[in-house]
Amino acid sequence: MIFIYIFLFLSSAIIDSNGFAMAQKLEAKGGKGGKEWDDGAGHDNVAKVYIRGGLEGIQYIKFDYVKDGQSVEGSIHGVSGSGFTQMFEIDYQNGEHIVSVDGYFDKSGVMQALEFKTNRKTSEVIGYPKSNTKFSLGGVNGKMINGFHGSAGKALNSIGAYLTKVPPTKSELVGGWGGDYWDDGPNYDGVRKVYVTYMNTCIRSINIDYEKDGQVVTSSHGNKEGETEEFAIDYPNEFLISVEGTYDSILFPDHYVLVITSLSFKTSKGRISPTYGVVSGTKFVLESQGNAIVGFYGRNGGAFDAIGVYFSPI
């Protein structure tokens, strides 16, 4: 039974050159008429949605997509007649993306109304939903829609979508600019344990045990001279969601440097670690609502100079 399930999933997925699923193709919903169209799944995001409506339903739909940070105009699916055109814009440059679509079609197989939901807002219902059959696409936690397909003739008959994983986001780097830069990247499933070495003036180092495909991967950064304490996260039942701390200019060893002076950690279950180091200077908090920390980056030399994190949806 497990083998059959995997086969069925992959049969509706876009596969990369290494055999990994890049996007899942969701079956088109609506009527059976019209000619099939497919915008594909090779986009980074959706920038704008244009819908042309009339007395008999939605005449056409058009999407502007995002590729390599630039908006790319898409094709019209359907025809343009007398009616109204409405546009729904996604703030893709600031992390907004479509998570689901609700639609309504009538007995003749013509799409009558559509509603788009992003991770930040919901569009108005575009069209006339009353007394029509409703369907939904997407709405999977941690996933986003990055492409559409469907069928259209003299009107829009059906619509489907491509569902892909929401890409990680990178926080700002906080602290000083001394030491060497390092970056663990965002390609981990979660964090299992954090080790912090500190002295009475600053943080010296941080070690992280990551989870990756069922294995523990350890990353070490900084000088391990000092007192070391650890904070464990019960992954996958618990996630690291926040790093709080301070940074300050201290004398180390014979000149002043801007370094991280304290750190503490918070999990999705509300557990908070002790504060490691000494609280002094400027306070910072690295967190993003609805996201877990899946990677760290920073700078370190003799002391721990700066820290940043990667977020991924829980």
From Swiss-Prot:
Signal sequence interval, chain numbering: 1-23
Keyword Repeat: yes
MF-aspect GO terms: carbohydrate binding
Residue ranges annotated for the Jacalin-type lectin domain, each copy included: 24-165, 168-313
One Pfam family recorded for the sequence: Jacalin
Keywords: Lectin, Repeat, Signal
PROSITE patterns: JACALIN_LECTIN
Similarity remark: Belongs to the jacalin lectin family.
Name the UniProt record assigns to this protein: Jacalin-related lectin 9
Species of origin: Arabidopsis thaliana
